[in-house]
UniProtKB/Swiss-Prot annotation:
Record-annotated active site: 123 (n6-amp-lysine intermediate)
Known catalytic reactions: NAD(+) + (deoxyribonucleotide)n-3'-hydroxyl + 5'-phospho-(deoxyribonucleotide)m = (deoxyribonucleotide)n+m + AMP + beta-nicotinamide D-nucleotide
Protein's name according to its UniProt entry: DNA ligase
Residues given in the record as NAD(+) binding sites: 40-44, 89-90, 121, 144, 179, 295, 319
Binding site residues for Zn(2+): 413, 416, 431, 437
Gene Ontology CC: cytosol
Reported cofactor(s): Mg(2+); Mn(2+)
Family, as annotated: Belongs to the NAD-dependent DNA ligase family. LigA subfamily.
E.C. code: 6.5.1.2
The entry's keywords: DNA damage, DNA repair, DNA replication, Ligase, Magnesium, Manganese, Metal-binding, NAD, Zinc
Length: 689
């Protein structure tokens, strides 16, 4: 990444936009899908780069800046819960100087002459929750969500062993906040059970805890070994205590589990000593921690310090450095993904890092192998920092043997033997044999049945692989014909290895239930490159119904310029994504598959809660800087009133709202004779509606 102190304003503007998009994607994966896309260290580096750029160019801060947000927007499976007080994130520090700066900021802000006691406690690597008690009874349990609105998990939280359903001598209203987690040994046992049952293994204990809690069926959660600690009283903590250490004593009296490993530090030296103690002993703990949390102990002083957009000023998290180990690289295998992208994976001599046995590590892409000069039979340095797959960060050249061999970048697909396509701008190699590559087909079906797509439980990796190998399915449509095919077959599925009557009955039941699917989930399930859940929702909002969707994409496949322009105007669908959409529907087999799926599924029309107004169905464009309203707020207003917000002006545009320094869009609107108004007129329309 460029030196931010030498970066120009133009470059900074572009980079801030890229960082906001990237961090939003990682946040959604982490908080909603319970999935790490990047290491904690890489995420922190991106976030800190964003902060430093904003400090240098404060006038470039975006409305959707990561520094203003916590978590990610919640999914639609669970009821929404508005938090009494925001569940904010914590800022991070990484070394002693950062900690000293944190302490100095407290002193300077409060104008203190001496050290203010700091409460230190382990940072549990789990899932944050809030629990509300009214008259001593647990009434609401919720996840953090986006920090302001979480998901109602009351029934599931009640299944956690020893979680109080009723507390004595409690105030009329009480909130507690904490972390739900799974211990290391329980995680190992759970993954062993998942593997034996042919289900996907969890990537790490946090992922397992989050996935276990976010179950629609609370009986599934009840079977998972979830534990919890509380560390905060949320909106009510200052009603029952005057400091953090006093609060934890009180919560313990109420019957909650609090972490006994903590320290009230009276000096910087005591802070550093506690940090070193935990860093040294973390592997001896039964649960995962990834740092130490420091909080100003006195609540009155906390009140004076207050908050910034996404975090309190009075607290921070001192992250541990990534755990590094060394082992031998035995070979490099190549995986082919759903969209044909090839990824190199290092096969390693097993090594234990941070209590987890590691035998594989990502090499990201083939350029990385060349850049790091990684060779087969090298001794490599391995880093694990909460990653789904640990990373190779370097090679011990001093240990390189004469039989270490260079890895040759493949020219042909390891699955179908097709010639590969190198895409320099994306630093990727891709197999373009979309229809006949077995690996791509397998990954496409896996994506189709996944939780956020068709959500067909009972079709894990092993089951999909088995059904493909036996010739029982070869595409998503076959899944819905499987029961009929099984009934007509002499060799029943329930009599095959790994199956039984009950598991087959459950599978067919789950397949049947999945036939009712929303349009956004259906579009996402198709596996179009670069169409994640958010973009699938954008397309569903545009097409509104399955019938309209299929008719429009058929026109798009015939190069209809109106459909192209309509999609190109959608905010969030750029040129690159539009090319991927066109490429997908250029394949006639894809359109035929979608038509056949439409015959066996009940695809629900897209419905979005919006007010009916004179703007309903109108296409509006904002251009220039609005004097009193942010672009994000203006867009939200328009969409709430039923309008569609486009990013460019065309003959389909109904209204242009022009602000200060409006440029080419305003000019084009005048040329096309489109109605143009200023912000004042726009707000009048909104207020009248």
């Amino acid at each position: 990444m460029q030196n931010i102190y030498l970066i120009s304003e133009k470059e900074a503007k572009k980079l801030l936009k890229e960082l906001a998009d990237k961090i939003e994607r990682y946040n959604h994966a982490y908080y909603i899908e319970n999935n790490h896309l990047v290491s904690d260290a890489e995420y922190d580096q991106l976030f800190n780069t964003n902060l430093k750029l904003e400090q240098k160019f404060p006038h470039l801060i975006l409305e959707n800046s990561p520094s203003k947000k916590v978590g990610a927007k919640i999914a639609n499976k669970f009821a929404k819960v508005t938090h009494q007080a925001p569940m904010l994130s914590l800022s991070n520090v990484f070394d002693e100087q950062d900690v000293k700066d944190f302490v100095d900021r407290i002193k300077n802000f409060l104008r203190l002459n001496e050290f203010a006691p700091i409460f230190c406690e382990p940072k549990i690597d789990g899932l944050s929750f809030s629990a509300i008690y009214k008259n001593g009874l647990l009434t609401i349990g919720a996840t953090r969500g986006d920090g302001y609105i979480g998901e109602d998990m009351t029934a599931n939280i009640k299944t956690i062993k020893n979680f109080p359903h009723k507390i004595n001598n409690a105030p009329e209203f009480l909130e507690v906040r904490g972390e739900i987690y799974i211990e290391k040994q329980d995680f190992f046992n759970l993954n062993k059970e998942q593997e034996e049952q042919g289900r996907d293994k969890f990537a790490n204990p946090r992922n397992a805890a989050a996935g276990s809690l976010r179950q629609l069926d609370s009986s599934v959660t009840a079977k998972r070994p979830l534990k919890y600690f509380v560390y905060s009283g949320g909106a009510t903590e200052q009603n029952i205590a005057s400091s953090q250490n006093e609060l934890l004593k009180k919560l313990k009296e109420f019957g909650f589990r609090v972490n006994e490993i903590s320290k009230l530090a009276d000096s910087e030296e005591e802070i550093f000593a506690f940090y070193e103690y935990l860093k040294t002993n973390r592997e001896n703990l039964s649960y995962e921690i990834d740092g130490v949390v420091y909080k100003l102990n006195d609540f009155a002083l906390q009140n004076r310090m207050g908050f910034i957009a996404r975090a309190p000023r009075f607290a921070t998290a001192h992250k541990f450095p990534a755990i590094v180990g060394q082992t031998k690289l035995l070979s490099i295998t190549v995986q082919v993904g759903r969209t044909g992208t090839l990824t190199p994976v290092a096969e390693l001599e097993p090594i234990e890092i941070g209590g987890v046995t590691v035998s594989r590590a990502t090499l990201h892409n083939f350029q990385e192998i060349i850049r790091k000069d990684v060779r087969i039979r090298d001794y490599v340095f391995l880093q694990r920092a909460g990653d789904v797959i640990p990373q190779i960060i370097g090679v011990d050249i001093g240990k390189r043997s004469t039989d270490a061999t260079t890895f040759n970048t493949p020219l042909f697909c390891p699955s179908c033997n097709s010639k590969l396509h190198y895409i320099p701008e994306d630093i990727i190699i891709r197999c373009d044999n979309v229809l006949n590559c077995p690996a791509q087909n397998y990954e496409r079906i896996r994506h189709f049945v996944s939780k956020n797509a068709m959500d067909i439980e009972g079709l894990g990796r092993k089951q999909v692989e088995f059904l493909i190998d036996k010739g029982l399915i070869s595409n998503p449509l076959d899944i819905f014909l499987l029961k009929e095919k099984n009934e007509a077959s002499l060799t029943k599925l329930e009599n095959m290895d790994g199956w039984g009557r009950k598991s087959v009955e459950n599978l067919f039941k789950n397949i049947e239930e999945s036939r009712n699917v929303s349009l956004p989930r259906f579009i996402y399930a198709l596996g179009i490159r670069h169409i994640g859940e958010q973009n699938a929702k954008l397309l569903a909002r545009e097409f509104e119904s399955y019938n309209n969707f299929i008719s429009q994409i058929e026109l798009l496949s015939k190069n209809d310029s109106n459909i192209y322009q309509k999609l190109n105007n959608l905010e969030g669908i750029g040129d690159k994504i539009l090319v991927d959409i066109i490429n997908f529907f250029d394949v006639k087999e894809n359109i035929e598959l979608i038509k056949k799926l439409g015959e066996v599924l009940n695809i629900e029309d897209y419905k979005e809660t919006k007010e009916h107004s004179s703007l309903t169905g109108k296409i509006v464009v904002f251009t220039g800087s609005l004097p009193t309203t942010s672009r994000v707020e203006a867009k939200a207003m328009a969409e709430k009133l039923g309008a569609k917000v486009a990013v460019s002006v065309s003959s389909n545009t109904d209204l242009v709202i022009a602000g200060v320094d409006a440029g080419s869009k305003l000019k084009k609107a005048k040329e096309l004779g489109i109605k143009i108004i200023d912000e004042e007129e726009w707000l009048t329309i909104v207020n009248n509606v």
